[in-house]
């Protein structure tokens, strides 16, 4: 929509510069639900009403690509919107075609184009995927650059680079669904465009962070960034100018584990120099009480740096040291034989701040002293006194809750059990039902996040005394007092009553619990970032197959002693001797690109996107097929359809005429089924456990491989 008086303001201004420009732009403001309005970076250049020369390099980032414009009504200029089907760059091309005639643009500060970013039917999340437009986009970029017959004006470099950079950030640039040969060719085409851009187009872009700048420079064929390692100083130069310098490295502490007499620190090192160095040119060195040793490293998941693909190769590592006594730990980075110190910085799971100067994990107190991490073994009394003293740094309800939790933990041994709000129960429930029987002095509570209509069927009267509502004041107290947390779903939001890691910061020193990730299926989707040892809050993980052990160790970098090979609790409740009925279970998984995230861990289906998708069309064709119905009738078989909880509302959208195709409820007895059909559901391993046949049916395989879902590969 347009703000009042926008049209009059723009037309009045256009009349004053009519002979000078063919196009006048005005402010576009992006609105998204209740978030503050967002302004495009072009308004750092367009600061006042006037005419801007697009041949001037300082105006290269105006990048007029939307239709917040007013143009001359000149039917003879032959410039129209490109109406080619699925072109998707029609606004951008139209603006480019008009502006290149005079290389000038007018800007009027009055008026506003109000752009609703909260539109659930926006095409950005779907048809802007490279699955649909990579070839179209590249052809447009290449034709635009080639049309200049030589050096491309900086303004048009900025247009194309801006498209590349935001698509990389949103993971909408690279065509992952291509074959390896096609993918390599696609990357060469991108690099050929970068070759025609000035370095300033990359370095000076107002919306590209430091690490992305070095990623793009490292890809530019005619740019050769060089790392210069001097005594006490490290720098990067490109074509004779310095583009980075530092004398130390930021080292980000992610987690500290303490177990079996050892402390284990998990960290990664940040620096753009890793974009321009080979693996053999650097080392990570630990100094424990003055004794130095080189550490083994792996590529950190934080190498993506505000993207979905790695833009740099940050080294991550574990450093072990004794848990008893007192120890001083420092780290150094060696670049071509020269050592540089590190600055220790804390991440959410290992927080030091102005108010939190120490914390204790399993009997070991950690403090920071400049560039040194100091560890010291302490008993429960010293831990208690230190935490009470630290509470004095807080006020009001935070201080009150802290002190209550410190006192409660001192007198009680608390263990908590969780599933997720999207399911009635899972492995957290089964583990709770098993453990609550023990009389060992431990207080056990199942944290529930939905109301149960059949509570007496799920829990005995005694067990109901140990149910605590998620997010309640009692949950907060127990969470801060807990010694062990068992959860079927990873992350902070499924377990924390404070909503996020940020909400836990005032209490971070009190979170001295071990997290046992029970899982809710056998991990086989490639979720390297989400489930990595660096990101997933899990001290131990229950695994169910030798494949899973190798997968977690190799691809997710978990040490072997973090894995518990007992199998998921729910497998104890599967009767492998039960005879199957004449029924087939069809359980497709959900799709991120057909939903919207309401808040963390909560997704909502968008009906309009679902109904227009290949995912829905192909599933409908299958479920509504007369041939299928006849086959089911002929074999006296029923097909039960179990939709993922996130897309369960879609069951009313199918037009199924056969009584032999049945929409199943949230819970099914898998022993009843002779066969299982799915795309990626982890239920597949439950049927493997039963030794029942499995059939894969992926209705949108191309979109899946292109990365439109939240993963694009399987680890199988």
Identify the function of each model-found stretch:
Residues 48-71, 128:
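A recurrent flexible, glycine/aromatic-enriched loop bordering the glycosyltransferase active site
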Residues 87-94:
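Acidic donor-binding loop at a coil-to-helix junction in glycosyltransferase catalytic cores
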Residues 5-42:
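Conserved donor NDP-sugar-binding/catalytic core segment of glycosyltransferases
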Residues 150-151, 157, 424-432, 436-439, ...:
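Conserved catalytic-core segment of nucleotide-activated headgroup transferases in glycan assembly
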């Amino acid at each position: 929509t347009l703000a009042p008086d926008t049209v009059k303001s723009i037309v009045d201004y256009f009349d004053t510069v009519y002979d000078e420009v063919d196009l006048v732009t005005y402010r576009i403001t992006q609105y998204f639900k209740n978030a503050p309005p967002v302004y495009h970076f072009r308004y750092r250049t367009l600061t006042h009403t006037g005419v801007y020369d697009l041949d001037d390099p300082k105006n290269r980032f105006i990048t007029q690509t939307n239709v917040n414009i007013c143009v001359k009504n000149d039917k003879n200029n032959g410039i129209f919107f490109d109406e080619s089907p699925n072109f998707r760059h029609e606004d951008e091309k139209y603006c480019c075609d008009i502006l290149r005639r005079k290389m000038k643009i007018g800007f009027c500060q009055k008026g506003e184009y109000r752009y609703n970013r909260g539109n659930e039917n926006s095409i950005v999340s779907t048809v802007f995927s490279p699955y649909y437009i990579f070839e179209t986009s590249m052809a447009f970029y290449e034709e635009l650059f080639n049309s200049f017959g030589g050096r491309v004006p900086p303004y048009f470099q900025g247009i194309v680079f801006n498209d590349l950079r935001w698509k990389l950030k949103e993971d909408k640039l690279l065509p992952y669904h291509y074959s390896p040969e096609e993918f390599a060719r696609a990357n060469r085409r991108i690099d050929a465009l970068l070759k025609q851009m000035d370095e300033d187009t990359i370095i000076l872009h107002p919306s590209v962070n430091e690490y992305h700048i070095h990623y793009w420079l490292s890809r530019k064929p005619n740019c050769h960034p060089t790392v210069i390692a001097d005594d006490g100083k490290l720098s990067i130069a490109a074509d004779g100018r310095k583009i980075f310098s530092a004398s130390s490295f930021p080292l980000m502490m992610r987690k500290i584990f303490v177990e079996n007499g050892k402390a284990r620190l998990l960290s990664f090192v940040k620096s753009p120099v890793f974009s321009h160095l080979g693996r053999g040119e650097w080392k990570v060195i630990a100094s424990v009480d003055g004794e130095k040793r080189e550490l083994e490293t792996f590529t950190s998941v934080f190498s993506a740096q505000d993207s979905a693909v790695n833009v740099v190769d940050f080294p991550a590592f574990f450093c072990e040291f004794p848990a008893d006594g007192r120890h001083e730990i420092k780290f150094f980075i060696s670049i071509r034989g020269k050592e540089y110190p590190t600055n220790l910085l804390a991440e959410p799971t290992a927080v030091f701040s102005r108010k939190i100067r120490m914390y204790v994990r399993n009997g070991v107190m950690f403090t920071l002293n400049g560039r040194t991490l100091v560890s010291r073994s302490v008993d429960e009394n010293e831990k208690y006194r230190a935490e009470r003293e630290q509470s004095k740094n807080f006020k009001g309800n935070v201080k009150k809750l802290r002190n209550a939790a410190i006192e409660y933990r001192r007198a009680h041994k608390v263990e908590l059990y969780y599933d997720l709000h999207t399911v009635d129960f899972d492995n957290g429930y089964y583990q709770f039902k098993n453990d609550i029987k023990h009389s060992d002095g431990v207080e056990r509570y199942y944290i529930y996040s939905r109301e149960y209509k059949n509570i007496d069927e799920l829990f005995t009267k005694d067990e109901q005394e140990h149910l605590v509502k998620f997010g309640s004041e009692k949950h907060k107290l127990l969470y801060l007092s807990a010694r062990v947390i068992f959860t079927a779903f990873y992350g902070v939001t499924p377990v924390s009553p404070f909503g996020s890691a940020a909400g836990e910061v005032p209490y971070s020193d009190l979170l001295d619990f071990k997290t046992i990730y029970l899982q809710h299926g056998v991990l086989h989707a490639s979720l390297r970032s989400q489930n990595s040892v660096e990101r997933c809050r899990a001290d131990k993980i229950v695994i169910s197959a030798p494949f899973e052990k190798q997968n977690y160790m190799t691809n997710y970098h978990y040490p072997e002693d973090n894995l518990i090979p007992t199998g998921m609790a729910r497998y104890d409740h599967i009767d492998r001797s039960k005879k199957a009925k004449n029924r087939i279970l069809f359980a497709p998984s959900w799709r991120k690109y057909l939903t919207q995230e309401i808040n963390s861990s909560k997704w909502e289906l968008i009906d309009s996107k679902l109904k227009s998708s290949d995912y829905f069309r192909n599933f409908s064709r299958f479920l509504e097929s007369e041939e299928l119905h006849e086959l089911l009738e002929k074999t006296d078989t029923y097909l039960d359809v179990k939709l993922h909880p996130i897309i369960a509302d879609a069951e009313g959208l199918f037009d199924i005429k056969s009584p032999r195709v049945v929409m199943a409820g949230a819970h099914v007895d898998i022993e009843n089924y002779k066969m299982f059909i799915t795309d990626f559901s982890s239920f597949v391993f439950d049927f493997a456990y039963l030794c029942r046949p499995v059939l894969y049916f992926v209705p949108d395989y191309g979109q899946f491989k292109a990365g439109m879902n939240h993963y694009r590969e399987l680890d199988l």
